[in-house]
């Protein structure tokens, strides 16, 4: 077929979608009594993939994506008229999907989308094989093949943040004097 022998590829169109969806939803709850005030929040974030999806016949979908859920809870207990105990808990769980062994500084797919000549090869030929340019002297790499065949990696990150505060108003001894003790613990698991 002539289009396979003499390709004219818009690599940006072949590699990227017109747009990527991103959304964020959250729910907050607050209230309290004379003894306790509370605030709670849950948030979900989804970042879609800008790269087009191609069948790689390997049983997985390569590409990019990110999902994260956050939670927060703040409780303020009025133990006495002059003593307040505060508990603040927050955490998140995130999953980042990338092609296997992809780093944050790897821009090769972007570079080749704008640098590969339109007549170098087709992204995918009619027999299902990916285009390949044997001499890479002109920077002709097939980013469609790279993204589709590079595997898929999911990196999870879990964060837990806590702080506990005890405040004692000593205004009865010295006007405006308050003593505060704070304990906090932050953990990140990757």
Predicted regions and their residues:
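Short glycine-enriched, charge-decorated loop/helix-capping segments at active-site entrances
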Residues: 55-61
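Short, solvent-exposed loop/turn segments enriched in Ser/Thr/Gly
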Residues: 159-161
């Amino acid at each position: 077929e002539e289009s396979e022998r003499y390709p004219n590829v818009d690599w940006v169109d072949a590699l990227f979608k017109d747009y990527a969806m991103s959304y964020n939803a959250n729910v907050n709850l607050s209230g309290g009594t004379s003894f306790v005030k509370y605030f709670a929040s849950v948030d979900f974030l989804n970042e879609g993939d800008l790269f087009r999806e191609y069948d790689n016949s390997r049983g997985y979908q390569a590409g990019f994506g990110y999902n994260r859920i956050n939670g927060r809870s703040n409780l303020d207990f009025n133990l006495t008229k002059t003593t307040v105990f505060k508990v603040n808990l927050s955490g998140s769980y995130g999953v980042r999907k990338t092609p296997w062994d992809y780093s944050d500084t790897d821009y090769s797919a972007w570079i080749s989308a704008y640098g590969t000549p339109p007549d170098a090869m087709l992204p995918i030929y009619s027999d299902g094989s990916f285009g390949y340019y044997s001499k890479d002297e002109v920077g002709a790499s097939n980013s469609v093949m790279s993204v589709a065949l590079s595997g898929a990696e999911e990196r999870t990150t879990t964060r837990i943040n806590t702080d506990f505060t005890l405040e004692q108003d000593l205004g009865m001894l010295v006007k405006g004097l308050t003593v505060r003790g704070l304990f906090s613990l932050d953990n990140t698991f990757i």
